[in-house]
């Protein structure tokens, strides 16, 4: 029997599972245009939001209870032009200087080494200043390991 897998679908299955469980979704655009929107929620579950504006970064990192479900969130600073419908990389991913990795110099960046662990055999949440982070990329749990998926979703609910 071959188990279904996917290669980095950028949190699509996680979003679908949380939506089916009744979690409210907010788009990046909504947060960027109205950063205070997050204040109405006791908990914010971040997916793989790698490219964010400064307004989004500040709104998310100032919320007291964020669950960073995927590593590599908040990695690069962008600017959005809603009139021209363009996104411009401002900082991060070795830009504008080679030594710049995280565009916000964020001390809680957990991209390396966790972004590429998609097996999640020893998946854990660990505490940060504003919430919790995972130590692996859990996307394939939504297809393969129902027991571990159940435990993950229960933990998200309880945090």
PLM regions: where:
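C-terminal substrate-binding/active-site "lid" region of AdoMet-derived donor-dependent transferases
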Residues: 76-99
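Aromatic-Pro/Gly-enriched surface loop or interdomain linker
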Residues: 1-37, 83, 99-159
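Short alpha-beta junction capping motif
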Residues: 37-82
